[in-house]
Amino acid sequence: MFEHVGPADYRTYFRTAGKLLAADGVMLLHSIGRSDGASPINPWVEKNIFPGSYAPALSELLPEIEKSGLIVTDIEILRLHYATTLALWRGAFLNRRDDARRLFGEEFCRMWEFYLASCEAGFRYERFACVLEYAA
């Protein structure tokens, strides 16, 4: 969900979260993120998979978290775990590809397989930081 908040609304998002947390509350933010700094999402992914999404870089989020009064206590970068997850999703998809083709067509199947394989490579080879988990 956080990938659809967008940079323009980060400050509001974190300030609102800070106001809603109990004094001893903990927030866990789970998001796909970038390891190569701020940049727009891939145009193909924007058009075909996640319209309106944005994968943030740490450098974009940390200042907004700090300004909101939240304190970051831990950051986990789980890119290799997510690469494995994507490989498993792709395998499961390929096991049922004929069913998917009957339901959605060959073009969809090729697109989805390409998406899963390219994202797996991106997470495995550090294009994406993937699954940034912030505890605040």
Positions of predicted regions on the chain:
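A short SAM/SAH-binding and catalytic strip from SAM-dependent methyltransferases
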Residues: 1-9
